UniProtKB/Swiss-Prot annotation:
Gene responsible for this protein: aroC
InterPro entries listed in its UniProt record: Chorismate_synth, Chorismate_synth_AroC_sf, Chorismate_synthase_CS
Free-text function comment from the UniProt entry: This reaction introduces a second double bond into the aromatic ring system.
Residues covered by region (Disordered): 45-64, 109-134
Gene3D superfamilies: Chorismate synthase AroC
Enzyme Commission number(s) from the entry: 4.2.3.5
Uppermost EC category: lyase
Binding site for NADP(+): 48
Keyword line: Amino-acid biosynthesis, Aromatic amino acid biosynthesis, FAD, Flavoprotein, FMN, Lyase, NADP
Pathway: Metabolic intermediate biosynthesis; chorismate biosynthesis; chorismate from D-erythrose 4-phosphate and phosphoenolpyruvate: step 7/7
An annotated GO cellular component: cytosol
Required cofactor(s): FMNH2
Listed name of the protein: Chorismate synthase
Amino acid sequence: MSASQFGSRFVITTFGESHGTALGVVIDGCPAGVNFDEGLLKKELERRRPGHHGSGQIVSGRQETDAPEVLSGVFDGKTLGTPMAIIVRNQDARSQDYSVIKNSPRAGHADDMWRNKFGHSDHRGGGRSSGRETVSRVMAGSVAQMMMKHVSAPTKVIGYASQIGPMTLTDAERAEVSKKDIDSFQARFPSSRDQEVADLLKKAQDNGESHGGVAEILIQNPPAHLGQPVFHKLKSDLAMAFLSVGATNGFELGLGFEAAEVKGTQFHQGPQDAYGGIRGGISTGESILLRVSFKPTSSILDVAKKGRHDPCIVTRAIPVLEAMTWLVLADHYLWSKTDRI
């Protein structure tokens, strides 16, 4: 099995299964001299865990400590420029909850596809196709964020849920997201209707139901000129990064699919945010707005009631999408340093 690597310059290799001994990442390409912020690493892992800011009633009941162990690549609080390995150990797996899906895969899940493709797979907790795989992405993204803060301090990445099930942010609510503490909302749905969304998800969880939704990522003050002009456009690498996350179903940049309905005189002479901060595959330095849709989670009916599952992945996916964004930014920043002499 291959394809567990991501990146061209800032390269990560992730490993581990949901109910295995540990999950981890090897990072190769992070320059020496970056201040290693262990507090940031722990904070981002905590944000990915179930139960952030009182969200415990609307997410999986699995409680892992996710305490990171840095095995290499850091000394005296700074990166060495050598391969960096970080792991977290699994401590709260309940493999018996998954005995039923060993021979009866969940509808729409990767369970049977992995088994059919490879002939042998780990069904416990979904194995490597589990959402728990994203722990490795968040650890890697934390290091990428450290590097970007070292070279581009003003850059910010803000993720939030813009739609969960039938509930959608208004344009006015969306315009205010950068002023809000997204994590203070149970469902990371920055609206006065956040409790309604939480109630919707709690009801779904109690009834063995699930919901899909949409997450948005806003990149403020990105470095200009990131992205290669043909096969590694910034937008194409961001799309690949997002669509590699489990349960994703669609991707949009800027005006997205709405651009198909707009006349050229409106699109090109209107607000610049229609481009989403990227033109010709290269960042302009303006804010970048990205949107990704998620299908309803596959653990439904009796499987959902017996196990510990999320009724909607969007809430938990926000830190993961932010991490993938930082990875793409770090990768393209290092790449941009070789664009010209």
